[in-house]
Each structure stands twice: as structure tokens, then as C-alpha cells.
Amino acid sequence: MSMAREELAERVRALLPPRVHCLEKRMFGSIAFMRNGNMLVAPLKDGSMLARVGKEGMDDALARGASIMDMNGRSMSGFVLLSGDMVEDDDALSEWLQRCLLFVDTLPQK
């Protein structure tokens, strides 16, 4: 696993609130943090992060500088890509984790 991805994964683990239980699952050549069977975030090899904000959260996330998540030429609805700069400090990363948790906690458990 790349150093940037592992460092970001460690920060995600440290910043998730204690009450939040997430499982870690290998996906996208990375570690995806899963909440109740739904993907929350996934740190990527270049230090960027896949984040699940939901369709309703897309416009706000894009306005804040996120990009549409594209996998093999297809956009992933409800998911955005956060550049490494967007999650560089713990306050920013924590804010994005909270946004993702607010959405993912509305989804049915899988």
C-alpha cells in the first residue's frame, strides 16, 4: 500500500468519532471504510480520497472543490473525489468525514 494512502487511512481511523464503528474492506486497490455495510470513504494511492456524500450532497461538495468520481469513464453518483490538498489537515478531513457520516447513516444497513 502506498505511503500516502496508508497515512490517510491512519488519519481516518484516528478522526472517526469513537461511537462510529466502521469495518475496513479491500476495494479499489485500497481500504474502504464501511459503515453498516455501506461505503463511507476510501483513501487512494495518491493521497486523495473517495467520499460518499449522496446525490443531495453533490452540489455542495463540488462547490467546495471536490471532483465527480469517475471510474472507467462512468461517474459514480453520490461519490466525489477529494484531492489530497482538500484533506491535508485534520480539521478539513474531520469535516468531510462528518459530511459522509451524515449521509451514510441515512442508508439502510446491508
Model features per residue range: what roles?
Residues 1-110:
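Charge-dense, helix-prone N-terminal extensions
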